[in-house]
Design a protein with these regions (language model features):
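Outer-membrane beta-barrel "beta-signal"
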Residues: 27, 491-503
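Transmembrane beta-strands of outer-membrane beta-barrel proteins
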Residues: 57-63, 100-105, 157-163, 200-204, ...
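Transmembrane beta-strands of outer-membrane beta-barrel pores
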Residues: 63-71, 107-111, 152-156, 165-169, ...
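Outer-membrane beta-barrel translocator domains and adjoining extracellular loop/strand segments
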Residues: 71-78, 114-120, 171-179, 213-220, ...
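Outer-membrane beta-barrel channels and translocator barrels
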Residues: 94-98, 153-157, 194-196, 262-264, ...
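Short, flexible helix-coil linker/hinge segments at the edges of structured domains or between repeats
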Residues: 116-130, 205-249, 277-290, 332-336
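Long, internal scaffold/assembly segments composed of regular secondary structure
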Residues: 234-374
Length: 503
């Protein structure tokens, strides 16, 4: 028995030692895929600093399938899930020690299921000023994305520019036949200056947004009214019904300020300030402006970090969003023209989200990182007259881990796991039922039921990369899955499969 134990122990030792020798993951893959990079997501919005993000070149071409399904819609306007197919190419190239370029191109197609009370694209961006009906249904989607940037360093000065473009088409082939076409263009320019120990950066962003939207009915017996929504179940009654041809004009600007340690160790700060506006216009009424949504944002990220063989970051995140909505009071038509009598600010929405974060990890034979987050969020909405209110506040926590290791002589295995919990602290909904469409009251109560619920979130991912011969090419496969469990006894499931090559 002792001899057998010695043989087993010796065998396990040999396997462990062999695995340790071979367990060195691909260094380029690790640099570009490690969870530590999430800490720099805000910093890299300055293209001058994005140009210094990586020391190595990396490109990836992949196809993917994403499946999401909810047992009941948490938000009626977003539906119960989607099936999306995507092909995407990403690249980051070092042209020299002082310059780099990066880019992305993707095409996505698929279907959203069981959408109600929403006949536009980009619901989260434009709500509450949307076109909506009670029937809804599935929608087909197409999206094209093109992004590209360039950065260079001259002496102690870093300069960079970036362009991001999105075109999207969403439509339905049965009544009510909604069709929305979106174009979204963003331009960024940034600079940074190297001092003895810090990088001081500043960047500006300009955005132009447009969406055309219309709803048609092919069967006269199937016509239902399209509502012009104005917030918390309120409806602009005068222009609801047959005003189904709209477009949204919008855009805005943002300013980014950055302070980053040059050697990876020290205090850091990222500040974002921005304003955007989106106007809803009735195309069929001689381009009559109906409403305008203002969105102001301020974001702060500040803390201390140390990177190297051992990574550690402790920092705070805080975000404030103020959304105000103006409605135009319109007079009687005169020669097919509608005079605007006055403009009233009727919708107000304030969002605060603050969290404390810590990230710790090591990069030696393998790379692993653990991230922890604890935060507080409150969302207050108000419609002025007749008064409507919806207030929600919650605390949340999240724990995530990532492990990257070599597997065999040419393989790299990446595993990630995330768990989170969202706990409702306080919630309130007040709607004047007498002055509200019955179906809209039902919709608002449904959404509020899930807005004030508690949620438990679990997600996992596994990815394997395998080198091809002696070249820098590798092929990979990735599988992601997760579930969100709601205290209202409903849940969401998520599954994604991705296959591709890297070089």
């Amino acid at each position: 028995m002792n001899i057998q134990l010695r043989h087993i122990t010796t065998l396990l030792y040999i396997i462990a030692t062999t695995s340790l020798v071979a367990a060195t993951p691909d260094s380029v893959l690790t640099e570009h895929q490690q969870a530590w990079n999430l800490l720099d997501a805000e910093t890299w919005k300055n293209p001058a600093l994005h140009g210094q993000a990586f020391k190595t070149a990396y490109s990836q071409l992949a196809i993917s399938l994403d499946l999401t399904d909810q047992t009941e819609a948490f938000t009626l306007q977003k539906g119960t899930g989607s099936t999306l197919y995507d092909i995407e190419a990403d690249t980051y190239l070092r042209l020299s020690d002082h310059s780099s370029v990066w880019g992305k191109a993707s095409y996505m197609t698929g279907k959203n299921r069981n959408i109600k009370w929403n006949s536009v694209s980009d619901y989260e961006l434009l709500e509450p000023y949307i076109l909506a009906d009670t029937m809804g249904g599935n929608t087909e989607r197409e999206r094209y994305v093109f992004e590209g940037g360039y950065a260079a360093k001259v002496g102690s000065v870093l300069m960079g520019g970036e362009m991001l473009f999105r075109a999207e088409h969403e439509y339905r082939t049965i009544d009510p036949r909604m069709r929305a076409i979106v174009t979204d263009l963003t331009l960024r320019g940034g600079v940074a200056y190297e001092t003895g120990t810090y990088l001081l950066g500043a960047a500006a962003e300009a955005n132009i947004y447009k969406q055309t939207d219309n709803v048609t009915f092919y069967r006269e017996t199937g016509v239902i009214p399209e509502f012009q929504m104005t917030g918390l179940g309120a409806i602009y009654v005068r222009f609801s019904g047959e005003v189904n041809n709209l477009y949204f004009n919008g855009g805005g600007a943002q300013l980014y300020l950055n302070v980053q340690p040059r050697n990876g160790q020290g205090l850091f700060t990222n500040i974002t300030i921005g304003e955007h506006r989106y106007e809803r216009i009735a195309a069929s009424l001689n381009s009559l402006p109906l409403t305008k949504l203002y969105r102001e944002e301020a974001k702060l990220q500040a803390g201390w970090r140390k990177s190297g063989k051992t990574d550690l970051a402790i920092y705070a995140d805080a975000q404030y969003i103020c959304r105000l909505g103006d409605e135009n009071m319109v007079g009687s038509s005169q020669s097919n023209s509608y005079p605007i009598l006055t403009t009233l600010t009727m919708y107000k929405n304030n969002i605060i989200d603050a969290s404390m974060n810590m990230v710790y990890g090591q990069r030696q034979h393998s790379s692993w990182h653990i991230a922890m987050k604890v935060g507080y969020m409150q969302n207050h909405e108000k419609y002025v007259e007749p008064e409507r209110k919806q207030n929600v506040s919650r605390i949340y926590s999240q724990l995530s881990a990532q492990y990257i290791t070599g597997l065999g002589k040419k393989g790299t295995l990446t595993c990630a796991l995330t768990g989170g919990y969202h706990k409702n602290l306080d919630s309130q909904l007040s709607i004047p039922v007498v002055n509200t469409e019955k179906a809209a009251v039902k919709m608002q109560n449904h959404n509020f039921r899930y807005l004030k619920a508690d949620y438990t979130v679990v997600n996992a991912q596994i990815r394997y990369d395998y080198g091809i011969g002696t070249s820098r090419y590798a092929m990979f496969g990735a599988l992601s899955g997760g579930a969100t469990f709601c205290s209202e006894s409903e849940y969401e499931q998520y599954l994604a499969v991705k296959l591709g090559i890297t070089f």
